[in-house]
């Protein structure tokens, strides 16, 4: 009977330890997903602009802020 009690206590400790480590793993995975989503949102919020020789109508559409004859230029 005494051996059974000790065995049950050891099993309970092992199970609680396993549950504790699994819980931390889920939290870190969620944090990783949240970090990934934050990067995507930041990237989407960045100014969208046309590179060299991209069609444009106004200066602000070009990364260089130079729209000449409907195309982005490197220099004004």
UniProtKB/Swiss-Prot annotation:
- A single GO CC term, please? extracellular region
Residue ranges annotated as propeptide are 20-46
TM ranges: none
Superkingdom is Eukaryota
- Keyword Isomerase among record annotations: no
Q: Which Pfam families match?
A: Conotoxin
GO MF annotations, alphabetized: ion channel inhibitor activity; toxin activity
Chief site of localization: secreted
The intrachain disulfides are: 49-63, 56-67, 62-72
Tissue occurrence:
Expressed by the venom duct.
* Protein family (similarity comment): Belongs to the conotoxin O2 superfamily.
Tell me the function of this protein: Gamma-conotoxins may act on voltage-gated non-specific cation pacemaker channels (HCN). Potent neurotoxin.
Q: List the protein's name.
A: Gamma-conotoxin-like TxVIIA
